[in-house]
């Protein structure tokens, strides 16, 4: 039935007068906001009254203020305040970062030591800490460094001469600052998505590289606002060191107004200088936050002097054959570096439990080199856990996994298996690439930086060589024009294609796909599946967890059906999809086909 027949009395052939009206000639009257206007007038009146009262009252002593604002004693005190602030901010931030990393360490004793330090230093008032440090010479006459349990002394110096008032002030401010800054950094670290750590680990990046290249740059977006609050508070806290008779800005002002009795003008001298310091710090905070917001916004505002510094950037090396990509997907078969024999994966009776829930139960699988295996099954059947176990992101409770006869997570010496340390496991992971369900691209790095990070840091490739190969991979996934884009500026399908290119950059023997299309809109699924189809012809061993049954039929050599942590049935696509033997397999396929 035609849609127009459902609306009685409306003739679709007629055109109403309203539809013919040309609104472009109408004058637009902006919305009125009387409350906003009243608020603006009130704010202007308050500002005018305050300024008038301040600058017309002679008791403020602006003449005395002008006389002392640039006076030499004040500037010397200001310099000491700035020096203390800078030294304590830098050293406190470094020590605080180390304490934060210790707090999230897997060593219980190290984490407890860090917690105890933070608890103690946050509990002690600043003025008490400064006085204790200033009187440390009473407790320890000398500071000695020597060889433990021997009489050999390497360093010996009187405490009172070593711990001057300036040194005591610097040490006290640093210790106090580090305790508070440690919790700020820890909060920033915890704010970074766990998937970022898993992605970095799957690429084989070292723990140090994960921390300083992946986690901390992202954590800075959370750290900076509260961190700069602490630095601003530190600048003002330097006034507390007056208890050590150290002539910083506030102490110097106190000495002057006690002599000339001009209290208010001299206090205003200190106040305005503190305002100047805070203003400079606030401006610095603004630009530093903008720098670390890379990738967080789709259209970032260019930083000052960006054009100047870009002149010193090295141009990217061209690809070997000078090809350019027009956005069309090219065949991976033409990429020489990707035509390699995949690794054979053998899964020997692995089991895994999370508390009382057994997610994998005595799994046995043999995946030949160069094969394409699709794992299907209902949600919660253990499919993703199995993938994570293959590259040791999830440690199994029992059983073993090998790639080309080499055990994952262990090294064999005779008839003894030794569990590998984390750094050795990271090296093994370079042969097992993984593409995550939620992409897990590093948002603060460009597309190019995402791809070349692991080849340079893990494989030891020359940067130019890594860039050439990255550009080749991007051409193959149809994204050469996105080389300088950030992940947030890409669609979901584009992000997943970049994730595939990133995993391929390590030239792995085995490539794992964890539901690569589940986070995509239906319109974007096809472009990712096309890439995987081309990969299936390169010889790399592919293991794909998917709900795309039609895709599994087309690309897979074998299909594995899982439920409740068990492999219910495995076989060729024809056997599983057309002639499944197990009733549970048939029931599942009846719902999804």
Where are each of the predicted segments found?
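Transmembrane alpha-helices and adjacent helix-loop boundaries
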Residues: 2-318, 579
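Catalytic Walker B motif of ABC-type/P-loop ATPase nucleotide-binding domains
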Residues: 511-514
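H-loop/switch region of ABC-family ATPase nucleotide-binding domains
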Residues: 546-547
């Amino acid at each position: 039935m035609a849609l127009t027949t459902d609306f009685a009395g409306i003739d679709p052939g007629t055109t109403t007068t309203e539809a013919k009206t040309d609104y472009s000639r109408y004058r637009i009257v902006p919305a009125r906001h009387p409350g906003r206007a009243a608020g603006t007038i009130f704010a202007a009146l308050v500002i005018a009254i305050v300024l008038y009262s301040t600058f017309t009252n002679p008791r403020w002593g602006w003449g005395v203020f002008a006389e002392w604002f640039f006076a030499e004693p004040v500037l010397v005190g200001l310099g000491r305040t700035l020096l203390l602030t800078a030294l304590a901010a830098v050293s406190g931030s470094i020590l605080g970062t180390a304490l934060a990393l210790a707090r999230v360490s897997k060593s219980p004793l190290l984490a407890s030591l860090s917690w105890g330090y933070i608890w103690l230093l946050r509990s002690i008032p600043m003025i008490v800490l400064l006085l204790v440090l200033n009187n440390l010479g009473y407790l320890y006459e000398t500071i000695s460094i020597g060889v433990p349990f021997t009489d050999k002394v390497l360093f010996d110096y009187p405490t009172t001469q070593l711990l001057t008032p300036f040194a005591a002030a610097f040490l006290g401010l640093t210790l106090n600052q580090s305790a508070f800054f440690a919790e700020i950094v820890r909060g920033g670290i915890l704010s970074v998505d766990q998937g970022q750590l898993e992605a970095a680990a799957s690429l084989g990046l070292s723990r140090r590289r994960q921390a300083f290249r992946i986690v901390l740059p992202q954590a800075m977006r959370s750290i900076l606002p509260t961190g700069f609050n602490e630095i601003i508070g530190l600048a003002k806290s330097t006034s507390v060191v007056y208890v050590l008779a150290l002539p910083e800005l506030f102490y110097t002002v106190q000495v002057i107004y006690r002599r000339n009795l001009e209290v208010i003008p001299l206090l205003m001298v200190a106040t305005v200088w503190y305002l100047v310091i805070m203003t400079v710090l606030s401006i610095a905070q603004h630009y530093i936050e903008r720098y670390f917001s890379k990738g967080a916004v789709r259209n970032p505002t260019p930083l000052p002097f960006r054009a100047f510094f870009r002149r010193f950037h090295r141009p990217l090396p061209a690809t070997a054959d000078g090809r350019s990509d027009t956005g069309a997907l090219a065949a991976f078969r033409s990429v020489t570096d990707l035509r390699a024999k995949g690794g054979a994966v053998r899964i020997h009776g692995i089991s895994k439990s999370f508390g009382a829930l057994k997610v994998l139960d005595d799994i046995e699988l043999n995946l030949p080199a160069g094969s394409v295996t699709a794992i299907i099954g209902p949600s919660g059947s253990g499919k993703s856990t199995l993938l994570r176990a293959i590259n040791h992101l999830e440690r199994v409770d029992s059983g073993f996994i090998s790639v080309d006869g080499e055990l994952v997570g262990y090294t064999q010496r005779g008839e003894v298996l030794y569990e590998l340390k984390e750094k050795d496991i990271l090296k093994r992971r370079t042969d097992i690439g993984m593409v995550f369900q939620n992409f897990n691209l590093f948002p603060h790095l460009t597309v190019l930086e995402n791809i070349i990070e692991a080849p340079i840091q893990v494989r030891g490739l020359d940067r130019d060589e890594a860039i050439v190969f990255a550009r080749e991979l991007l051409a193959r996934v149809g994204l050469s024009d996105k080389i300088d884009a950030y992940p947030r500026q890409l669609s979901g399908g584009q992000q997943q294609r970049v994730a595939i290119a990133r995993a391929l950059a390590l030239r792995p023997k085995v490539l794992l796909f964890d539901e690569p299309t589940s986070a995509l809109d239906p319109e974007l699924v096809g472009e990712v599946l096309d890439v995987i189809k081309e990969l299936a012809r390169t010889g790399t061993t592919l293991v794909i967890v998917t709900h795309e049954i039609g895709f599994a039929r087309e690309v897979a050599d074998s299909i594995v059906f899982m439920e409740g942590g068990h492999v219910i049935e495995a076989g060729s696509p024809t056997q599983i999809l057309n002639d499944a033997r197990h009733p549970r397999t048939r029931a599942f396929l009846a719902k999804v086909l």
